[in-house]
Amino acid sequence: MAKEKFERTKEHVNVGTIGHVDHGKSTLTSAITCVLAAGLVEGGKAKCFKYEEIDKAPEEKERGITINITHVEYETAKRHYAHVDCPGHADYIKNMITGAAQMDGAILVVSAADGPMPQTREHVLLARQVNVPYIVVFMNKCDMVDDEELLELVELEVRELLSKYEYPGDEVPVIRGSALGALQELEQNSPGKWVGSIKELLNAMDEYIPTPEREVDKPFLMPIEDVFSISGRGTVVTGRVERGVLRPGDEVEIVGLREEPLKTVATSIEMFRKVLDEALPGDNIGVLLRGVGKDDVERGQVLAQPGSVKAHRKFRAQVYVLSKEEGGRHTPFFVNYRPQFYFRTADVTGTVVKLPEGVEMVMPGDNVELEVELIAPVALEEGLRFAIREGGRTVGAGVVTKILD
């Protein structure tokens, strides 16, 4: 059977389910796809995934870390959604920190029978740390709770929890429903109130989660992978465009690894030996730079729109430390630990200068906030992902949560 062409007519938004173990994240993911597949939402489209298909998530590797993660896609009349679901708690932490699947918005699933639990809090905290901008709440298992007052109480608790982590707890949509109830209604061919709750959730996602700014509309940035000298023409840098657009004649800055950025002009752009009149995100290109010597530029710097990104040495980060079983360290590390930090194409030694209060050491398998000082400045911004390596192996992954210099 021929594959359907990916239609770019609808806005694209990345979402994912988060929340405590057994509160029904995978069941909800299944219910969303099956309600849409049943044609019960006008303009909606999906392939129905059973719970088992979502729960046995395939393994993926991101920055040297193995994560179990399921990707599904579906459409409402307004949008195309890419949706991620992770079976295990550790998988969520790893996914959110490595950015294996970035989220424009998250669906926080809370069991009405239990209310917010420890992992509910941890996921909301992480969502805040790694900049998931919007959260929509699905209060699941409402078919198991007869007491209206209990539902009110759980909703209040969830709103307070969101406010505590700087989400607008009073404005966040909270949908009361039952994912399993919706699947049962579909099975009995009698869509009712629980299928209605899934439709309500989709509507809340469409209305409440804004469409993210497209990569192509952001300021241009390309991590430099390689530098060549072409006799008679000058210096060429190669790399893959991360965001924005570059056209011949554009002014650019070379940022990182040196104290000051270097201004230059992109005189010509090539891809697969053909000259390009514009480079877009994802393009692997070579850029000829005006008046730049081969020694003025190196791998690990970035080529960027002037003024759009600065180089920094000090930052705070949320880090996941690989366990011994994942090929990580076998022993803890302490303040003054000095591994290599990999940002895009840059590989720079840094020192862990601060751990959270009361934390003396970090064990393999931990998820921790720490402060780092690099020996050379790197083009950094909040939300940037990195890997931590020592002796050629990955021992951790992190995300920059705050620039400190």
Curated annotation (Swiss-Prot):
Transmembrane segments: none annotated. The gene is tuf. It is found in: Cytoplasm. The lineage of its organism: Bacteria, Pseudomonadati, Aquificota, Aquificia, Aquificales. Its main location: cytoplasm. Residues 85-88 are annotated as: G3. Its EC number is 3.6.5.3. Residues 140-143 are annotated as: G4. GTP binds at residues 19-26, 85-89, 140-143. This is Elongation factor Tu. Mg(2+) binds at residue 26.
